[in-house]
């Protein structure tokens, strides 16, 4: 998501340190949300990640050191969190990373975005497979307003990654063509 936002904003020439650290923190928080709310899919959202990101548990270094341990977070999310803590010892560095990521996630504070991104009934895993009915997904974005471009870029990226997974399962070729227009 961090890369999608950078690309949609014309970024990519910025300092890779900040982008990488934002991505690492985002990965840790997504893992946190997936583990803590494993039985409640309605809370496995970017909006929930944003709430945690802007809490004292992330900004206050002393609280942050205990945050994942108190919630019994394990494996990759814990490793990513520890990597973040290792880099973000100073208030300025931590503020820069958290502030940059919060800016990129700000769209998930908008009620309309929360509503449409909270769940999906589109079976993207069926794209490119044999099926009885054709599937069409329309994504509209005005040329003059790039406000929601990061979310649209993320959706397209997710679809492309799923298409690669699907093709990998079927001898590196999709059973049905998929067109992006």
Task: Show which residues each predicted segment covers.
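P-loop NTPase motor domains
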Residues: 1-181
């Amino acid at each position: 998501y961090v890369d999608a936002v950078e690309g949609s904003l014309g970024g990519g020439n910025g300092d890779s340190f900040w982008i990488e650290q934002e991505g690492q923190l985002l990965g840790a928080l997504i893992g946190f949300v997936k583990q803590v709310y494993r039985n409640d899919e309605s809370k496995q959202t970017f909006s929930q990640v944003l709430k945690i990101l802007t809490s004292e548990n992330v900004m206050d270094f002393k609280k942050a050191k205990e945050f994942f341990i108190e919630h019994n977070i394990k494996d990759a999310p814990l490793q990513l969190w520890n990597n973040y803590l290792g880099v973000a010892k100073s208030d300025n560095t931590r503020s820069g990373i958290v502030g940059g990521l919060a800016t990129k996630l700000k769209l998930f504070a908008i009620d309309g975005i929360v509503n449409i991104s909270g769940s999906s009934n589109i079976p993207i895993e069926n794209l490119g497979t044999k099926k009885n009915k054709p599937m069409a997904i329309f994504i509209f974005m005005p040329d003059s307003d790039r406000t929601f471009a990061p979310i649209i870029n993320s959706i397209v990226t997710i679809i492309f990654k799923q298409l690669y997974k699907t093709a990998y399962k079927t001898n590196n070729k999709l059973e049905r063509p998929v067109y992006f227009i």
